[in-house]
Structure formats: C-alpha cells, structure tokens
UniProtKB/Swiss-Prot annotation:
Keywords: Cytoplasm, Hydrolase, RNA-binding, tRNA-binding. GO terms for cellular component: cytoplasm; plasma membrane. GO terms for molecular function: peptidyl-tRNA hydrolase activity; tRNA binding. Monomer. TRNA binds at Y17, Y68, N70, N116. This is Peptidyl-tRNA hydrolase. The gene is pth. It catalyses: an N-acyl-L-alpha-aminoacyl-tRNA + H2O = an N-acyl-L-amino acid + a tRNA + H(+); N-acetylglycyl-tRNA(Gly) + H2O = N-acetylglycine + tRNA(Gly) + H(+). It is an enzyme of class 3 (hydrolase). It comes from Mycobacterium tuberculosis (strain ATCC 25618 / H37Rv). GO terms for biological process: protein quality control for misfolded or incompletely synthesized proteins; rescue of stalled ribosome.
Length: 191
C-alpha cells in the first residue's frame, strides 16, 4: 500500500487575508477538499486544519496551517510526524513572486525564493526535498516592497482570473498525485 500524501496549502488565517496573493494555497486546498467531499477540521496535535480522503488509490491528508505564513513549519512538521509522511510525500501549494501571474509550475526541492512560509517548512522538515505546486503572482510594480505586495488583495482584473487559476492549480495537484512529478510536469508546464 502506498504511503499517504500530505498536501499543504500555505496562507494566513483570518478574513483580513482571505483574498490576498499570499493565500492562494488555502484557496486551492479548499478546492481539493471540495472535490474529495472532505471537510476541514482542527487537528489538535498540530493546530492546523486537516481534511482526509483518497485519490488515485492513496490516502490524502489536506492541511491548512492556522498560524501565520512565516510559522507554517511549526504545524506542518508535527503533521508529517503524526501521519508518518516522509518529506518526499509532502506537496506544498504556494504563491510565487518569481512566476508570471497565473503561471503554474511543479518542482521538487530548490530554494525558498524569499518565501518565508517555505523557509519555515524547510526548517521544520530539515530538507528542501518536498514537492511544490507554485502559483505565479508576478513581481510587485515599481519599487513596491514584495512583503507588502503579497499581503495585498488582487487587482480587479487579476481577481477575475483567480478562480480559473486556482482550479488549474487544483488540477495540477491532482495530476501530481495521480501521475507523479515528471509526467505531471510535462502536462502542466505545457499549459
């Protein structure tokens, strides 16, 4: 029997952050849970919200940390331990400043690219070698501070595209679960 997968959507808790660029991981996690017919519930040992289900014959644990982005690892580390999930079987879904708005890319490992949520996950897991679903939000205009940019709401034009982008990111995550990294990359990177 295949090991379970831990699929984590990164974001910040609370209504103030719900529509910000930094919360795309939460939106995609919610879509995946809805597709599985699963509901998020508090996980007492980690503090995260967790939903469970099955996809492609594998047990899935969907998670949304309920701490701020830069502390995400504090809840992901204990979840991985509780469910006995190795880093290679963890998928982290997150926004990415280094990708053009709306572009979706899959990869294993690599740097954090200034993403404090990823930095926290790497510190908690002790490795960079976990799977990632990267959702492009683009660079801030002009000299705007990237830290402020990721916490802003989308522009009206971007907001109109966000539902489609998040559905595509959920599709990409499902392909990754069903087919593995290389076949999923070949398909997703052609979109």
């Amino acid at each position: 029997m295949a090991e379970p997968l831990l699929v984590v959507g990164l974001g910040n808790p609370g209504a103030n952050y719900a529509r910000t660029r930094h919360n795309l991981g939460f939106v995609v996690a919610d879509l995946l849970a809805a597709r599985l017919g699963a509901k998020f519930k508090a996980h007492k040992r980690s503090g995260a919200e967790v939903a469970t289900g099955r996809s492609a014959g594998r047990s899935l644990v969907l998670a949304k940390p309920r701490c701020y982005m830069n502390e995400s690892g504090r809840q992901i580390g204990p979840l991985a331990k509780f469910y006995s999930v190795a880093p290679a079987n963890i998928i982290v879904i997150h926004d990415d400043l280094d990708l053009e708005f709306g572009r979706i890319r899959l990869k294993i490992g690599g740097g954090e690219g200034g993403h404090n949520g990823l930095r926290s996950v790497v510190a908690a897991l002790g490795t960079k070698d976990f799977q990632r679903v990267r959702i492009g939000i683009g660079r801030p205009p002009g000299r705007k501070d990237p830290a402020a940019f990721v916490l802003e709401n989308f522009t009206p034009a971007e907001r109109a595209e966000v539902p489609t982008i998040c559905e595509q990111a959920a599709d990409a995550t499902e392909l990754l679960i069903e087919q593995g990294m290389e076949p999923a990359q070949n398909r997703v990177h052609a979109w």
